[in-house]
């Protein structure tokens, strides 16, 4: 089943894949990493002016990593804001996705957290560095194939 946004994207020749609707009826679309930045700009111009959240997850051990964006179209004339969920999948070996910081500034810390926990590099992000873990931390703690070091070996003696 195709939603309003997916139909609009098809009408304008914008490549994407419809993933259907979630339990709240929010349309979910898959965008290729190489197309994401230009489509993000198009969505902003179309009216999706608010990035509600960005998160990332490990799809399966040894599989793809996903970056998920929840966008909202807020207009004064609309009683019910229109929402869409965008999923961008990246290969595990060298996960690179264009940053949307320059489109929605609120992506700043959210993309940094996804980098810190899963190792997804957001190209052209102005300050992409660890935000939760120490800079010296090795590995990506939320990957399903991550092997946690013994906690007592990594903490400093106090």
From Swiss-Prot:
What compartments host this protein? Plastid, Chloroplast thylakoid membrane
Tell me the Pfam families matching this sequence: Complex1_30kDa
Going by the entry's taxonomy, the superkingdom of the source organism is recorded as Eukaryota
Q: Which GO terms describe its cellular component?
A: chloroplast thylakoid membrane
- Coiled-coil residues: none
Q: Which SUPFAM superfamilies match?
A: Nqo5-like
Choose any GO biological process term that the UniProt entry carries and state it: photosynthesis, light reaction
* PROSITE patterns, alphabetized: COMPLEX1_30K
Enzyme class, first EC level, given as a word: translocase
Q: Which reaction does it catalyse?
A: a plastoquinone + NADH + (n+1) H(+)(in) = a plastoquinol + NAD(+) + n H(+)(out); a plastoquinone + NADPH + (n+1) H(+)(in) = a plastoquinol + NADP(+) + n H(+)(out)
Keyword Chloroplast (UniProt): yes
Keyword Transport recorded = yes
What is the recorded membrane topology of this protein? Peripheral membrane protein
Subunit details for this protein? NDH is composed of at least 16 different subunits, 5 of which are encoded in the nucleus.
Q: What function is annotated for this protein?
A: NDH shuttles electrons from NAD(P)H:plastoquinone, via FMN and iron-sulfur (Fe-S) centers, to quinones in the photosynthetic chain and possibly in a chloroplast respiratory chain. The immediate electron acceptor for the enzyme in this species is believed to be plastoquinone. Couples the redox reaction to proton translocation, and thus conserves the redox energy in a proton gradient.
Q: Mind telling me what this protein is named? A: NAD(P)H-quinone oxidoreductase subunit J, chloroplastic
This protein's species is Cicer arietinum
């Amino acid at each position: 089943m195709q939603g309003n946004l997916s139909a609009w994207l098809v009408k304008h020749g914008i490549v994407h894949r419809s993933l259907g609707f979630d339990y709240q009826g929010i349309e979910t679309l898959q965008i290729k990493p190489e197309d994401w930045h230009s489509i993000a700009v198009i969505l902003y111009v179309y009216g999706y002016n608010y990035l509600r959240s960005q998160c990332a997850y490990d799809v399966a051990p040894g599989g793809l990593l996903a970056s998920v964006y929840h966008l909202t179209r807020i207009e004064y004339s609309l009683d019910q804001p229109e929402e869409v969920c965008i999923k961008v999948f990246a290969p595990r070996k060298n996960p690179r996705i264009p940053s949307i910081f320059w489109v929605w500034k609120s992506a700043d810390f959210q993309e940094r957290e996804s980098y810190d926990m899963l190792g997804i590099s957001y190209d052209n992000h102005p300050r992409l560095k660890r935000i939760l873990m120490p800079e010296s931390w090795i590995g990506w703690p939320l990957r399903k194939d991550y092997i946690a070091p013994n906690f007592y070996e990594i903490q400093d003696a106090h």
